[in-house]
């Protein structure tokens, strides 16, 4: 891959993060390749199929199309900790919104539970929002995310958050001094979990 064009998404996106983590796993740095910002997985797939790039990160269901058309995975990032799902609220509004936070988090948890407990419904939702109509791709997408997992306890993954800080440190040196706990307040999640 050295010197070749690798497709990715906008900086800071999960795909861009995954691209850089995958490069690191392959013993490369962003300076070793030519990163081309293309858009989402659909654009990366199209660029691969037309030979505009030699590699790129993708996620389900797009990666299943790549598998079917003869492309092969060079690295997976599933073994790397990552903070995937989160709600963002300004610190100054936490107290003002306190009465709404636990019900909101309860609804998020209900959605996660529905994902795991109602596969037929979840497959319809995946098909609708990915605009995918191949039943095999839809089912494999469901299984991928079921295994990748959503934390039912909604707790922050400190190792996952630290991984993001480490990633950011390459371009923002001040994040080297930061600790994950500086960036989140999990009091409402803890309150929800203690009410079980």
Region annotations inferred by a language model:
Residues 10, 32, 57, 75, ...:
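A generic structural-conservation signal
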Residues 165-196:
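Conserved C-terminal helix/tail region of periplasmic/extracytoplasmic solute-binding proteins
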Residues 11, 40, 78-79, 182-188:
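Residues that form or immediately flank small-molecule/cofactor binding pockets and catalytic motifs
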Residues 1-68, 84, 158-163:
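Bilobed "Venus flytrap"/periplasmic-binding protein-like clamshell domains
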Residues 24, 29, 72, 132-133, ...:
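Short coil/loop linkers at secondary-structure junctions
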Residues 42-131:
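Pocket-lining segment of extracytoplasmic ligand-binding domains
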Residues 35, 60, 78, 180-181:
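Proline- and acidic/polar-enriched loop/turn elements at helix boundaries
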Residues 96-176:
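Secondary-structure end/capping motifs
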């Amino acid at each position: 891959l050295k010197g070749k064009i690798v497709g990715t998404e906008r900086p800071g996106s999960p795909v861009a993060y995954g691209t850089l983590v995958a490069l690191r796993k392959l013993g490369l740095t962003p300076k070793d390749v030519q990163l081309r910002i293309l858009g989402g997985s659909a654009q990366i797939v199209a660029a691969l199929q037309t030979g505009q790039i030699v590699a790129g990160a993708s996620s389900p269901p797009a990666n299943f199309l790549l598998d079917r058309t003869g492309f092969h995975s060079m690295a997976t990032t599933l073994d790397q900790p990552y903070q995937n799902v989160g709600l963002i609220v300004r610190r100054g509004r936490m107290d003002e919104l306190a009465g709404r936070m636990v019900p909101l988090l309860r609804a998020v948890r209900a959605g996660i539970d529905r994902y795991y407990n109602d596969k037929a419904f979840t497959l319809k939702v995946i098909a609708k929002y990915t605009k995918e109509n191949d039943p095999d791709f839809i089912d494999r997408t469901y299984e991928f995310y079921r295994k990748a997992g959503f934390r039912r306890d909604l707790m922050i993954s400190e190792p996952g958050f630290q991984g993001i800080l480490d990633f950011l440190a390459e371009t923002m040196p001040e994040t080297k001094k930061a600790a994950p706990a500086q960036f989140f307040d999990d009091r409402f999640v803890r309150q929800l979990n203690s009410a079980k």
